[in-house]
């Protein structure tokens, strides 16, 4: 459950380390983002000589949340951290690698490139 002002980890090799949620996209009443939702983020911490710099405002897709997500079969999945992957205007990841597992819910939201780059899909 991600909302405005939430800090997240970057789960890719775009160069960002910490992200800060500015806005949850999806209408005026959408307050919280879950796995697979797109958010607007600011890069709070980045490594030197990277694709993104500190202060950049980009879009990202949430891939892991500490708040559990209920699945249609009644099971729940939750992760140890809140993480997102930075994406461009075409909804393709900026980085070339994804770190850590990602949730299966991304497949239903058509983020196939992130699914294929991820080492594990839970």
UniProtKB/Swiss-Prot annotation:
This is Large ribosomal subunit protein uL14. Part of the 50S ribosomal subunit. Forms a cluster with proteins L3 and L19. In the 70S ribosome, L14 and L19 interact and together make contacts with the 16S rRNA in bridges B5 and B8. PANTHER family: 50S/60S RIBOSOMAL PROTEIN L14/L23, LARGE RIBOSOMAL SUBUNIT PROTEIN UL14M. Binds to 23S rRNA. Forms part of two intersubunit bridges in the 70S ribosome. One of its GO terms (biological process) is translation. It comes from Syntrophobacter fumaroxidans (strain DSM 10017 / MPOB). NCBIfam families: rplN_bact. The gene is rplN. The keyword Ribonucleoprotein applies. The keyword tRNA processing does not apply. GO terms for cellular component: cytosolic large ribosomal subunit. Disulfide bonds: none annotated. GO terms for molecular function: large ribosomal subunit rRNA binding; structural constituent of ribosome. Keywords: Ribonucleoprotein, Ribosomal protein, RNA-binding, rRNA-binding. SUPFAM superfamilies: Ribosomal protein L14. Belongs to the universal ribosomal protein uL14 family.
